[in-house]
Amino acid sequence: MQGSVTEFLKPRLVDIEQISSTHAKVTLEPLERGFGHTLGNALRRILLSSMPGCAVTEVEIEGVLHEYSTKEGVQEDILEILLNLKGLAVRVAEGKDEVFITLNKSGSGPVVAGDITHDGDVEIANPEHVICHLTDDNAEIAMRIKVERGRGYVPASARIHNEEDERPIGRLLVDATYSPVDKIAYAVEAARVEQRTDLDKLVIDMETNGTLEPEEAIRRAATILAEQLDAFVDLRDVRVPEEKEEKPEFDPILLRPVDDLELTVRSANCLKAEAIHYIGDLVQRTEVELLKTPNLGKKSLTEIKDVLASRGLSLGMRLENWPPASIAED
């Protein structure tokens, strides 16, 4: 029993009933009242829509140009074959996001997933899954199948606008169901701990396609949920700060030579004689200081003030950290 009235009970794994290799029931208890539905619904949604897995996304069938055609010697039409390929349960080695597998079959009878040729990085979890039927001994079918890793459900229509220009004729797109979970349901029953009878027991009933064990699927779903909730544990601002462009320390015009002001020869020579080489040097001088410059009179001073004003500058400005390193090194 919890140590205080404010402490929440923590569920423990009570039972895993393995009905088959792909079907299991997982029971957790005790849960505080209402938490059965809270956790059950959250896990159910993640298991159905957010579990990563592998699925067939494209197929090329020899002699077939589009999905609305038929193939001689094959009982099913092409749309039925594509629908059957959606049910292919494929496990691909970690580290590979896409693989290609092939199928070549001839002779009368069913064509099943076990007829597919693949390398050691691929495993077919449902080898008895029927893809199509060949109707006579001379019939044959050959196809190249693309399997990709993804998450959730992605219809073929969502990929058409991205690939239509590059997709060659005869490459057929397949609706991709990446989730390894086929069915998921949960039930909340009454549970009891000592004198408390208002507690919940959560029973999760789940079936997978065989590429992932039910127990591991629930473990992964719980991990996804916990990672998403981490942000709420510490509500500090965790946004990545925007990178701001560094503003130059000085207005670029201040780094330009005095000659760019196009002063009269007399005024320009007077400034050079006083070692005023850059506009930044000039704007820091006052009128009084410039009038003390030999051969620089009021007419030249007025010219300098007017030229600076036309550029939004004036005499007597204060520039911190002047001169910049690039000028000081010169």
Swiss-Prot record:
<dbReference type="GO" id="GO:0000428">
    <property type="term" value="C:DNA-directed RNA polymerase complex"/>
</dbReference>
<dbReference type="InterPro" id="IPR011773">
    <property type="entry name" value="DNA-dir_RpoA"/>
</dbReference>
<comment type="function">
    <text>DNA-dependent RNA polymerase catalyzes the transcription of DNA into RNA using the four ribonucleoside triphosphates as substrates.</text>
</comment>
<keyword id="KW-0808">Transferase</keyword>
<feature type="region of interest" description="Alpha C-terminal domain (alpha-CTD)">
    <location>
        <begin position="250"/>
        <end position="330"/>
    </location>
</feature>
<dbReference type="GO" id="GO:0006351">
    <property type="term" value="P:DNA-templated transcription"/>
</dbReference>
<dbReference type="InterPro" id="IPR011262">
    <property type="entry name" value="DNA-dir_RNA_pol_insert"/>
</dbReference>
<dbReference type="GO" id="GO:0003677">
    <property type="term" value="F:DNA binding"/>
</dbReference>
<dbReference type="InterPro" id="IPR011260">
    <property type="entry name" value="RNAP_asu_C"/>
</dbReference>
<dbReference type="InterPro" id="IPR036643">
    <property type="entry name" value="RNApol_insert_sf"/>
</dbReference>
<dbReference type="GO" id="GO:0005737">
    <property type="term" value="C:cytoplasm"/>
</dbReference>
<dbReference type="GO" id="GO:0046983">
    <property type="term" value="F:protein dimerization activity"/>
</dbReference>
<comment type="similarity">
    <text>Belongs to the RNA polymerase alpha chain family.</text>
</comment>
<dbReference type="Pfam" id="PF01193">
    <property type="entry name" value="RNA_pol_L"/>
</dbReference>
<dbReference type="GO" id="GO:0003899">
    <property type="term" value="F:DNA-directed RNA polymerase activity"/>
</dbReference>
<keyword id="KW-0804">Transcription</keyword>
<dbReference type="InterPro" id="IPR011263">
    <property type="entry name" value="DNA-dir_RNA_pol_RpoA/D/Rpb3"/>
</dbReference>
<feature type="region of interest" description="Alpha N-terminal domain (alpha-NTD)">
    <location>
        <begin position="1"/>
        <end position="236"/>
    </location>
</feature>
<keyword id="KW-0240">DNA-directed RNA polymerase</keyword>
<dbReference type="Pfam" id="PF01000">
    <property type="entry name" value="RNA_pol_A_bac"/>
</dbReference>
<dbReference type="Pfam" id="PF03118">
    <property type="entry name" value="RNA_pol_A_CTD"/>
</dbReference>
<dbReference type="InterPro" id="IPR036603">
    <property type="entry name" value="RBP11-like"/>
</dbReference>
<comment type="subunit">
    <text>Homodimer. The RNAP catalytic core consists of 2 alpha, 1 beta, 1 beta' and 1 omega subunit. When a sigma factor is associated with the core the holoenzyme is formed, which can initiate transcription.</text>
</comment>
<keyword id="KW-0548">Nucleotidyltransferase</keyword>
<protein>
    <recommendedName>
        <fullName>DNA-directed RNA polymerase subunit alpha</fullName>
        <ecNumber>2.7.7.6</ecNumber>
    </recommendedName>
</protein>
